[in-house]
Regions:
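A short, hydrophobic beta-strand element within the central beta-sheet of small alpha/beta folds
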Residues: 81-91
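Conserved phosphotransfer active-site motifs of two-component signaling proteins
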Residues: 61, 90-94
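Conserved acidic segment of CheY-like receiver
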Residues: 3-14, 19-23, 55
Length: 146
C-alpha cells in the first residue's frame, strides 16, 4: 500500500515540497502536508480528523529530543496507521538500536541522494522498515560509537 497522505514535520518548509516531488514519481496520488513541529501535529485541530499514512520527522539538530520515543508513540496513537520516518542531519546509533521498540519505521540521512529517499518510500509502502545507506554503513562499521 502506497502512503498517499503524508505529514512532514520539519523546521524547513521546503522539505515537504521536495518530498512531494520525490514521492509523486512513484505515487501520483501522494499528498504532502507540512507543520514545523511535533507538538503542532499533536495538538492542532487542523489534523484532528486526518489519517496520515506516513509521518516524516525531520531535524537539523545534532540530536533528537530525549523523549522522542514518547513523541513517536503519541503520533502513532493519534494517527493510528501512520508509519514514522526520521529524516536526520546527524547519526545517532541509539535510534537504530531502538527502532523496533520505539515504533520508528525508517531512519534516513538528510543528505542521501533522491534515489535513496525514493527507495525508503517504496520499502515503507511494502510494509518494511528501512535504514538508509549512510546510517546503515555507520552502524555496521562503528556500532554504538559516534
Amino acid at each position: 500500500m502506497n502512503p498517499d497522505k503524508i505529514l512532514v514535520i520539519d523546521e524547513m518548509p521546503i522539505v515537504s515540497l521536495a518530498m512531494q516531488e520525490i514521492f509523486r514519481t512513484v505515487n501520483t496520488a501522494a499528498v504532502v502536508e507540512y507543520t514545523d513541529n511535533i507538538f503542532t501535529a499533536l495538538a492542532s485541530k487542523v489534523y484532528e480528523n486526518s489519517g496520515f499514512d506516513l509521518i516524516i520527522i525531520g531535524s537539523q539538530e545534532d540530536v533528537f529530543p530525549e523523549n522522542l520515543p514518547e513523541l513517536v508513540e503519541e503520533l502513532k496513537g493519534r494517527f493510528r496507521k501512520a508509519r514514522i520516518m526520521l529524516f536526520a542531519a546527524s547519526y545517532n546509533p541509539a535510534i537504530i538500536a531502538e527502532m523496533d521498540r520505539s515504533g520508528i519505521d525508517a531512519y534516513v540521512h538528510k543528505y542521501e541522494p533522491l534515489a535513496e529517499i525514493r527507495k525508503t518510500y517504496l520499502r515503507l509502502s511494502a510494509g518494511e522498515s528501512y535504514i538508509s545507506e549512510i546510517f546503515r554503513t555507520l552502524y555496521s562499521e562503528y556500532g554504538m560509537k559516534k
